[in-house]
Swiss-Prot record:
Residues found modified as N-acetylalanine: A2
Domain of life, per lineage: Eukaryota
Organism name: Bos taurus (Bovine)
Protein name as catalogued: Elongation factor 1-gamma
InterPro entries in the cross-refs: EF-GSTs, EF1B_G_C, EF1B_G_C_sf, Glutathione-S-Trfase_C-like, Glutathione-S-Trfase_C_sf, Glutathione_S-Trfase, Glutathione_S-Trfase_N, GST_C
Length: 440
């Protein structure tokens, strides 16, 4: 029987999979999710942690015998028993099928729809509507499968049920209001059956289903961003002007003493995003630019793209300090399933994480399964491609063709508008918009 420690951050739905599986199998799993034992964004970046888990990702599991494994599905499998994994080769294959389905088909649209309502991702109306329809399709697929079944595989709970329930959890809690979910009675029955099992309740507690579909809250999104010092300082400076000089001085001293407070207000995920390691700035050799990228990103995240963010972009764009580029994936014939194509974009963005302060991009997947393409518009600091400035940034860029754009041309104006808004004819592509991702 497995026994060990699970490193994660609080309320991580991916960690729930292993914890529920352990409730069924009897595996002894200790959870470290809060300081001083585990500080997400700090502990998982230490040399000691990275020696055990090179990716630095959580959840991560360390067995009492020294065995280490990361990735939530692998951990859940490890702490499970034969019954959860599938007691026959056929059942085991079906369990893997549903676990894979959850990651490939449910996670992308669920994230696109739910994350903006939680204030952790930019909202795009068209993308959200597409995600809603995809979720509707998925719930319908599950509903048909569960019409004559109590559980996804066999007659008892397996890892298939645990994984799919955890993947659907935030949908049911945040956006699947009664009028939306009522069309899927079999899926609802199965979901409620699972979450009310003692083993699920021991981990999830009482799950309250959504009563009213949550909407994107621009204020919540702005507050959730790690870069929020500037607005606070501006607000503070306006308030300071209204105070007498002596009182302002006293207030400044109090603020200095309370310097750590803003970081304490961030949740664990935000602290990880904010905790960038100190390194030499590859763009330090460039002259100062009048274009403030962070301000544009705030406009893009919190205001209407077409009427506010785009006019701001062109009004403030510094053509000497920044450059625009069009990229296109070189090997469209290798693109098969759209979720896999989307993962190419996500993976590239993750590997370019330290470039975010000096770049912005909208990359779009066009088309359908086995007939798709990837292209995007990028805004880089400087006049050359940024990738050669750091070996960390050179993994993916050679898989794309790059063409520098003329900021003053009509073609560039159209490309920027269509790619930043995720709306338009996209005549140069010849395929319909599927989904997009923003690098910011």
């Amino acid at each position: 029987m497995a026994a060990g420690t699970l490193y994660t951050y609080p309320e991580n739905w991916r960690a729930f999979k292993a914890l529920i599986a352990a409730q069924y199998s009897g595996a002894q799993v200790r959870v470290l999710s809060a300081p001083p034992h585990f500080h997400f964004g700090q502990t998982n970046r230490t040399p000691e942690f990275l020696r055990k888990f090179p990716a630095g990702k959580v959840p991560a599991f360390e067995g009492d015998d020294g065995f280490c494994v990361f990735e939530s599905n692998a951990i859940a499998y490890y702490v499970s028993n034969e019954e959860l994994r599938g007691s026959t080769p056929e059942a085991a294959a079906q369990v893997v099928q549903w676990v894979s389905f959850a990651d490939s088909d449910i996670v992308p649209p669920a994230s696109t729809w739910v994350f903006p309502t939680l204030g952790i991702m930019h909202h795009n109306k068209q993308a959200t509507e597409n995600a809603k329809e995809e979720v509707r399709r998925i719930l319908g697929l599950l509903d048909a499968h569960l019409k004559t079944r109590t559980f996804l595989v066999g007659e008892r709970v397996t890892l298939a049920d645990i994984t799919v329930v955890c993947t659907l959890l935030w949908l049911y809690k945040q956006v699947l209001e009664p009028s939306f979910r009522q069309a899927f009675p079999n899926t609802n029955r199965w979901f409620l059956t699972c979450i009310n099992q003692p083993q699920f309740r021991a981990v999830l507690g009482e799950v309250k289903l959504c009563e009213k579909m949550a909407q994107f809250d621009a204020k919540k999104f702005a507050e959730s961003q790690p870069k929020k010092d500037t607005p606070r300082k501006e607000k503070g400076s306006r308030e300071e002007k209204l105070k007498p000089q002596a009182e302002r001085k006293e207030g400044k001293e109090e603020k200095k003493a309370a310097a750590p407070a803003p970081e304490e207000e961030l949740d664990e995920c935000e602290q990880a995003l904010a905790a960038e390691p100190k390194a030499k700035d590859p763009f330090a050799h460039l002259p100062k630019s009048t274009f403030v990228l962070d301000e544009f990103k705030r406009k893009y995240s919190n205001e209407d793209t077409l009427s506010v963010a785009l006019p701001y972009f062109w009004d403030h764009f510094d053509k000497d300090g920044w450059s625009l580029w069009y990229s296109e994936y070189r090997f469209p014939e290798e693109l098969t399933q759209t979720f896999m194509s989307c993962n190419l974009i996500t993976g590239m963005f993750q590997r370019l994480d330290k470039l975010r302060k000096n770049a912005f991009a909208s990359v779009i997947l066009f088309g359908t399964n086995n007939s798709s393409s990837i292209s995007g518009v990028w805004d880089f600091r400087g006049q050359e491609l940024a990738f050669p400035l750091s070996p960390d940034w050179q993994v993916d860029y050679e898989s794309y063709t790059w063409r520098k754009l003329d900021p003053g041309s009509e073609e560039t104006q159209t490309l920027v508008r269509e790619y930043f808004c995720w709306e338009g004819a996209f005549q140069h592509v010849g395929k319909a918009f599927n989904q997009g991702k923003i690098f910011k």
